[in-house]
Amino acid sequence: MSEIKEVRNKIKCITNTQKITKAMEMVSISKMKKAEVKMNSGRPYLKTIKEIINNFISNNTRYQHVYLEQRAVKKIGIIIISTDRGLCGNLNVTLFKKILDFIQNYNNRNITSDLSILGLKGLSFFKSLSNKIVYFNDYAKNNYTFSDCLNCNSIFMKLYSIGEIDRLFLAYNKFKSTLIQIPSIIQLLPLSKKKIHCHNNHWDYIYESDSKLLLNKLLNNYLEFQIYQASLENYTSEQAARMIAMKQATDNSKDLIRELQIIYNKARQDNITQELTEIVSGAAAISLN
């Protein structure tokens, strides 16, 4: 009897957990769809502003800017975009592993790294390393918006401008589809001239103000929005990964409940058989008397 009660309690607990994972799956689906719309709406802007910068520099090849300077690398900066919450599979783990390999590659060349971290999971993982964390933002406590990119971006821009860091990278999970999120590390600074000069057709613009001031503004805006767009990509990836993880948990709980139900039915059947045997034995004993 105690075994039946124990199995029944297990089934009840797993059923309650199943309801939670199913609810989290549905919430993640809703959040992912909203995030995907927001993410996709930002891609055309990022592409257009990059094309404008490309065309400007292609037609002003003598123009020099600190963000275009190629210099010897002594220290790098990495902006890491992670999540605040778990229950999203191995999304953070695969990204962190890629970042660790990336940092180690530079450490082998005696090049140090400074980190800027967005998300609690990134902070809890990388704070144990010897790398200096120059900036941190908590999504949960601060509703992350484009204005937050100004803080994250401005710190490394100053460090890069004064020569404290020589390269700046951005690490995040790129959203490709619901089932595929790609851990990515891209170079923000210096801007690659090879990529800039890849266009076959170029045209120049008529500038109402100083063209150099305009380019400086465009470059800063491009870098800020690149970080913001990456945060949208990572957030969409998080919701997709959590949706899949919760779906797998729900499916696994169904299988576990099914197995426990078989054990419960067998135990109950054995118990009924034992009771019937006792009744029959008792009746036989009475009839003999």
UniProtKB/Swiss-Prot annotation:
Swiss-Prot/TrEMBL keywords: ATP synthesis, Cell membrane, CF(1), Hydrogen ion transport, Ion transport, Membrane, Transport
PROSITE patterns: ATPASE_GAMMA
ATP-binding is among the record's keywords: no
Biological process annotations from GO: proton motive force-driven plasma membrane ATP synthesis
Membrane topology: Peripheral membrane protein
Transmembrane portions of the chain: none
UniProt keyword Transport, yes or no: yes
UniProt feature coiled coil, ranges: none
Location relative to the cell: Cell membrane
Main location: membrane
Annotated GO CC locations: plasma membrane; proton-transporting ATP synthase complex
A single GO molecular function term of this UniProt record: ATP binding
Summary of the function given for this chain in its UniProt record: Produces ATP from ADP in the presence of a proton gradient across the membrane. The gamma chain is believed to be important in regulating ATPase activity and the flow of protons through the CF(0) complex.
PANTHER family assigned to the protein according to its UniProt record, in alphabetical order: ATP SYNTHASE GAMMA CHAIN, ATP SYNTHASE SUBUNIT GAMMA, MITOCHONDRIAL
HAMAP family tied to this protein: ATP_synth_gamma_bact
NCBIfam families: ATPsyn_F1gamma
Assigned protein family: Belongs to the ATPase gamma chain family.
Complex and partners: F-type ATPases have 2 components, CF(1) - the catalytic core - and CF(0) - the membrane proton channel. CF(1) has five subunits: alpha(3), beta(3), gamma(1), delta(1), epsilon(1). CF(0) has three main subunits: a, b and c.
Stated name of the protein: ATP synthase gamma chain
Record organism: Buchnera aphidicola subsp. Melaphis rhois
Lineage: Bacteria, Pseudomonadati, Pseudomonadota, Gammaproteobacteria, Enterobacterales
Originating gene: atpG
